[in-house]
C-alpha cells in the first residue's frame, strides 16, 4: 500500500483543526484516518487530535483483521469508545464544552476496503477512471438535499451547510456508518475534510486523480487547488493506492 497525507491551514483560518495520518497495527496492516474538529478556543483541534490518537492507539494494539466483517465490527466498537472518551474529556474541561469532530477512517481487507464515517469528512474512490463518493454527509444540508427540499446548486452556498447532524464528542452514543467496497490495484482511495470538497468541484477532483502525476504530486495539487479557490477552511487530504508496498507520511 502507498499512502500520502497532507493537511494545510488554508488561507483564512488562524490555526488547523484537522488531523489524520497513516498508522499500522502489530502485523503492519494500515489504517488511514482524517478528522475535522469543531468548537471554539481551539477545542476543535483537541477533539480531532483525540479522535485520531485514540483510534490509532487502539489499532496499534491489534493483530491483523482479515475479513471485512471483522474490520467493520472493530471500527464500530472503537469509534464508539473514542466518542465516549471525547465526551468525558469535554465534560471535565469547561473551556472545551461543545467540542466535537468528524471522522472518516479506512482499513484494507484483501481485495476490499472498509470505510467508517461520522460527520461530513468524506471517502471517495476512483475506480475505472470514475470518481464516486462512498460516504454520506451527516449534515443538515445533505438531509435537505436528500429529501428534495433544496437543489445541489442551493447546497453549495447554503448558509447552514456547516451544521452537522452527527459528530464525535457531542452525545454519549453516536451512529457510525460503514461501507465495504472492492479495492483494486488500479484504484485510488481519497479521504478528505470539507475544506477540500467545499472548494474544489468533484469534476476537478476526478481530473486530478486521473492525471499521470505521482500520488505525492496529486496530494500537493489538491491542497494548492483548494487554496487557489479561496482556502476558506483547513484542508486535509489522504490518498491511498494498494499497488505499492510503500508507506507514505503520517500527520506531523
Curated annotation (Swiss-Prot):
Catalytic activity: O-phospho-L-seryl-[protein] + H2O = L-seryl-[protein] + phosphate; O-phospho-L-threonyl-[protein] + H2O = L-threonyl-[protein] + phosphate
Binding site for Mn(2+) 2: 36, 194, 233
Region (Disordered): 1-23
Sorted UniProt keywords: Cytoplasm, Hydrolase, Manganese, Membrane, Metal-binding, Protein phosphatase
Stretches assigned to the PPM-type phosphatase domain: 2-242
Entry keyword annotation includes Methyltransferase: no
Cofactor notes: Binds 2 manganese ions per subunit.
InterPro entries linked to this entry: PP2C (IPR015655), PPM-type-like_dom_sf (IPR036457), PPM-type_phosphatase-like_dom (IPR001932)
Family: Belongs to the PP2C family.
Protein name per its UniProtKB record: Serine/threonine phosphatase stp
Species, as recorded: Listeria welshimeri serovar 6b (strain ATCC 35897 / DSM 20650 / CCUG 15529 / CIP 8149 / NCTC 11857 / SLCC 5334 / V8)
Amino acid at each position: 500500500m502507498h499512502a500520502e497525507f497532507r493537511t494545510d491551514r488554508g488561507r483564512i483560518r488562524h490555526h488547523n483543526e484537522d488531523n489524520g495520518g497513516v498508522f499500522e497495527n502489530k502485523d503492519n496492516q494500515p489504517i488511514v484516518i482524517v478528522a475535522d474538529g469543531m468548537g471554539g478556543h481551539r477545542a476543535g483541534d483537541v477533539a480531532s487530535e483525540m479522535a485520531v490518537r485514540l483510534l490509532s492507539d487502539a489499532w496499534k494494539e491489534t493483530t491483523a483483521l482479515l475479513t471485512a466483517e471483522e474490520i467493520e465490527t472493530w471500527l464500530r466498537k472503537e469509534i464508539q469508545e473514542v466518542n465516549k472518551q471525547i465526551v468525558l474529556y469535554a465534560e471535565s474541561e469547561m473551556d472545551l464544552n461543545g467540542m466535537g469532530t468528524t471522522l472518516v477512517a479506512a482499513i484494507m481487507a484483501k481485495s476490499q476496503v472498509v470505510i467508517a464515517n461520522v460527520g461530513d469528512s468524506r471517502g471517495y474512490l476512483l475506480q475505472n477512471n470514475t470518481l464516486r463518493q462512498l460516504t454520506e454527509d451527516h449534515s443538515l444540508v445533505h438531509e435537505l438535499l436528500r429529501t428534495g427540499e433544496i437543489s445541489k446548486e442551493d447546497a453549495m452556498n447554503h448558509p447552514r451547510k456547516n451544521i452537522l447532524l452527527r459528530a464525535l464528542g457531542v452525545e454519549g452514543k453516536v451512529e457510525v456508518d460503514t461501507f465495504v467496497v472492492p479495492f483494486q490495484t488500479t484504484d485510488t482511495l481519497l479521504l478528505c475534510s470539507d475544506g477540500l470538497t467545499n472548494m474544489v468541484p468533484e469534476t476537478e477532483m476526478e481530473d486530478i486523480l486521473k492525471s499521470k502525476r505521482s500520488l505525492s504530486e496529486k496530494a500537493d495539487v489538491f491542497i494548492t487547488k483548494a487554496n487557489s479557490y479561496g482556502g476558506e477552511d483547513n484542508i486535509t487530504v489522504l490518498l491511498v493506492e494498494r499497488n505499492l508496498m510503500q508507506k507514505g507520511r503520517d500527520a506531523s
